[in-house]
Regions:
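Terminal targeting signals and extreme-terminal segments of soluble enzymes
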Residues: 1-73, 81-143
Length: 143
């Protein structure tokens, strides 16, 4: 299943070339990521005060420019879950379903109190896998 977040393009997102600046896409991905975790894990779990998912790496590909008057949305999907990390794929589309940009993010489970990585809580894996029917559990493949 795909999670969708509508994004409002703001005037200050636009650069001198008349399109959304490449740095602004990360705000769009962040907004969609927060919405995903709030919707899938629930507000209590997604407050991330004790346990969190932090970004370890991001790869963004810019496919086509986005302009001020475009109507865009971001799709978010977790494709794999390991013991301590997960992989998230996000895509920006316009109203005509044209792919504008993609992002692959690896996130790591983290204990705020211990200031160290932890295993992804089982309750998170359960909630994510109930939404993402085809998520791959990498740690099961390694066994």
């Amino acid at each position: 299943m795909i999670h969708k977040t509508d994004v409002q393009i703001r005037f200050n997102d636009i650069d001198i070339l008349g399109h959304v600046n490449n740095a602004v896409y990360q705000y769009y991905f962040d907004l969609a990521r927060v919405n995903y975790f709030t919707d899938i894990l629930g507000e209590h779990e997604a407050d991330f005060h004790a346990e969190a998912l932090i970004v370890a790496s991001i790869k963004v590909d810019y496919i086509m420019p986005v302009f001020l008057k475009d109507k865009i949305y971001v799709t978010t999907k977790i494709t794999s879950i390991g013991n301590k990390s997960l992989t998230m794929i996000q895509e920006v589309f316009d109203g005509k379903q044209l792919l504008k940009a993609t992002s692959e993010t690896r996130m790591v489970a983290y204990s705020i109190k211990k200031q160290s990585t932890i295993s992804i809580p089982e309750r998170w894996k359960t909630l994510i896998s109930s939404f993402e029917k085809d998520v791959v559990f990498k740690y099961l493949l390694d066994s």
